[in-house]
């Protein structure tokens, strides 16, 4: 099945939001296809009738599109080896179950969930790995009729042969599993739907998948799938198992570690380019020592040889840092469109503002943004009255010298001796001459009065955004409030 043009697949289950680890798997498959000029197939594994929904499928597809991870074949109508939803391929799975039944490679199992749990508990108490012990492996026809008369509906289990299962992993090298350690596994559930490993083998074969790239938590599944490939007479694809994303406690990343879905990072205001850049470098040597790489550079440099074998710890602080770099480099026109939904979510109607003012506002706050969602607090600081004074700003306003600086500034502005072309520079130069204040003693009182904080956009830009009238009003309010800080 190996070819010069690889066919890889991303096959998520629409049972919840797209996990960041699954997004990384999708990205690796996408990179592999784009690097080698192959094709990426999107397959929806929706045989879990209770948990799979079209709503989750739609959100999953939307997240992939947001990441710009396009596919060449999938449920949207592209491709000739569909359908690309497993729920639409049930007849195919049933036909191959019949083949395995005919060949004696499978048998019906009537064990209940309670019986299986009891067996599992017993094995664990003896410090043995849980596996099916073959209770129903050699039932007679009479046994089966008796159990079915009790209303039991069978699952179908694959007869596992003893002996080693070996395969060459493209990332990890030679891998070896013992068949007897696996136990006879279910390939079809009692409701007639195929189990994961059975459906995957059939789908990968008929979709002509050449390379399966997925997380290391699927290593044991690969051993199971290779048994099925042999039984069905299919040539197996190549396999590559990349490392998992870990939390700071070095356990598999989960909700208890914080944000874990692509949707959550979208809502936090992470840029897709920043997220992909971070995921590409996480636990790999693709960046060759560089922190920031363009998507084109990542495609060119991508190789499974550079994918890490050891689990990689997810560092959200580093992602935020990387995101800030992307925001700061984003052209204002493009950034405004990305900020628009976050401004509106914060409760402001962007359409009420004139375009030149909006452009200036975004340029002013851009160096201070870590995420797109940060824009809300800066808009509030600029457009809402009265401005909220935080504790650090209040401490500045308590200082004796502050009142003198602010009163002098207000007086200078009201005298109206400055041109509007370079208003800020002229008025601050005059303020420095009159008060003798320099550095923080000059600028910090002004910042605290106008913005309510001691950090933020450059003051000259704040002056322009607020306008002369608003600057005067905020100075007056700060002076009137000083009695409350004493």
Curated annotation (Swiss-Prot):
It comes from the Bacteria. GO terms for biological process: glutamyl-tRNA aminoacylation. Its EC number is 6.1.1.17. A motif ('HIGH' region) lies at residues 12-22. It is found in: Cytoplasm. It catalyses: tRNA(Glu) + L-glutamate + ATP = L-glutamyl-tRNA(Glu) + AMP + diphosphate. A motif ('KMSKS' region) lies at residues 252-256. GO terms for cellular component: cytosol. Keywords: Aminoacyl-tRNA synthetase, ATP-binding, Cytoplasm, Ligase, Nucleotide-binding, Protein biosynthesis. It holds the Pfam family Anticodon_2. GO terms for molecular function: ATP binding; glutamate-tRNA ligase activity; tRNA binding; zinc ion binding. ATP binds at residue 255. Catalyzes the attachment of glutamate to tRNA(Glu) in a two-step reaction: glutamate is first activated by ATP to form Glu-AMP and then transferred to the acceptor end of tRNA(Glu). Monomer. This is Glutamate--tRNA ligase 2.
């Amino acid at each position: 099945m190996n070819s010069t043009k690889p066919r890889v697949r991303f096959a998520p289950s629409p049972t919840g939001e797209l996990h960041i680890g699954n997004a990384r798997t999708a990205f690796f498959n996408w990179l592999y296809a784009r690097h080698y000029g192959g094709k990426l197939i999107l397959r929806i594994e929706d045989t879990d009738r209770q948990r799979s929904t079209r709503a989750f499928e739609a959100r999953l597809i939307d997240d992939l599109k947001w990441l710009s991870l396009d596919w060449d074949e999938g449920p949207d109508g592209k491709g000739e080896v569909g359908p690309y939803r497993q729920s639409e391929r049930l007849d195919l799975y049933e036909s191959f179950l019949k083949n395995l039944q005919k060949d004696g490679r499978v048998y019906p199992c009537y064990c209940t969930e309670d019986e299986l749990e009891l067996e599992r508990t017993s094995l664990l108490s003896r410090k043995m790995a849980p596996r099916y012990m073959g209770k129903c492996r050699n039932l007679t026809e009479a046994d089966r009729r008796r159990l079915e008369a009790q209303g039991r509906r069978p699952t179908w289990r694959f007869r596992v042969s003893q002996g080693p299962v070996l395969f060459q992993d493209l990332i990890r090298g030679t891998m070896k599993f013992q068949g007897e350690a696996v136990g006879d596994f279910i390939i079809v559930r009692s409701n007639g739907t195929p189990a994961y490993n059975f459906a995957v083998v059939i789908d990968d074969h008929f979709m002509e998948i050449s390379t399966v790239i997925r997380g290391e938590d699927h290593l044991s599944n690969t051993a199971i799938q290779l048994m099925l490939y042999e039984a069905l007479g299919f040539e197996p694809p190549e396999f590559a198992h990349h490392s998992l994303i870990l939390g700071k406690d070095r356990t598999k990343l989960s909700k208890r570690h914080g944000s874990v879905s692509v949707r959550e990072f979208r809502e936090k205001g992470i840029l897709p380019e920043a997220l992909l850049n971070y995921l590409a470098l996480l636990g790999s040597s693709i960046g060759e020592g560089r922190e920031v790489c363009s998507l084109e550079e990542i495609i060119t440099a991508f190789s499974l040889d550079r994918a890490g074998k050891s689990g990689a710890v997810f560092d959200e602080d580093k992602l935020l840092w990387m995101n800030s770099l992307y925001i700061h480099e984003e052209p204002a026109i493009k950034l405004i469109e990305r900020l628009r939904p976050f401004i509106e979510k914060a409760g402001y109607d962007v359409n009420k503002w004139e375009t030149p003012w909006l452009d200036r506002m975004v340029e002013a706050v851009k160096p201070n943004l870590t995420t797109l969602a940060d824009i809300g607090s800066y808009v509030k600081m600029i457009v809402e009255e009265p401005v909220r004074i935080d504790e650090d700003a209040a401490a500045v306003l308590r200082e004796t010298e502050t009142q003198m600086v602010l009163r002098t500034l207000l007086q200078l502005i009201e005298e109206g001796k400055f041109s509007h072309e370079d208003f800020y520079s002229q008025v601050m130069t005059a303020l420095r001459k009159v008060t003798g204040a320099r550095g923080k003693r000059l600028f910090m009182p002004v910042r605290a009065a106008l913005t309510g904080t001691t950090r933020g956009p450059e003051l000259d830009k704040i002056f322009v955004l607020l306008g002369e009238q608003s600057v005067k009003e905020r100075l007056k309010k700060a002076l009137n409030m000083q009695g409350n800080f004493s």
